[in-house]
Amino acid sequence: MTTEEKIINQTVHLIDTNGYQNLSLRKLTKELGLTTGAFYRHFKDKNELFQKVVIQLSKRFIEQIPLNEDYSSKQQLLIIAKYICQSITMHPNQMDFLFYQLSALDLYSNANQYPFLQKVKVLITNLNSSTTLSDQDLFIQIWSFIQGYALLIKNKITRYDAQLVEYTLDQLLKGKD
């Protein structure tokens, strides 16, 4: 494992444990037995580290979701929604980082660098056969629901309900005409 990979993996661990808001480069490098100079040989700054961590977490996240390419786009999207809702309760700090941290938000504009988001966009595009609603508008509606619902679950306002998620997805897809 390279030094850069060690830094990224330790960053993921610290984010999962303490949240990204509390990440200190000094603490990170100390735990790895590195100097801050060694850190800066691999990353320009904390923002660049966060961008690489977002990409790495995104890859891991999509690889961990039990998707079967034989399933329909709708079935795959429902599996992703369930996985997000489960993950936000098990790893709330990682999920906050992956979805709401500024480096992650910057990468949203380039889905090619964000494998998880790219997969979601492809599935939504496959579901959108309407000429009146753009793929982007449908994506925003579905993605907003999934993220909002996951936050309600994280904050213990509700519990995951697969029927509600499927019904809402069906309604969003019907409303596209």
Q: What does each model-found stretch correspond to?
A:
Residues 4-12, 21-22, 33, 41-66, ...:
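An amphipathic alpha-helix adjacent to DNA-recognition modules
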Residues 90, 143-161, 173-177:
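Amphipathic C-terminal alpha-helical segment
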Residues 1-2, 177:
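N-terminal intrinsically disordered/low-complexity leader segments
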Residues 85-107, 151-159:
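Amphipathic alpha-helical segments used for helix-helix packing
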Residues 27-30, 39:
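Append "Primarily bacterial transcriptional regulators
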Residues 105-132, 136-140, 167-173:
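Amphipathic alpha-helical packing segments from all-alpha helical-bundle domains
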Residues 52, 66-90, 139-142:
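Hydrophobic alpha-helical connector segments
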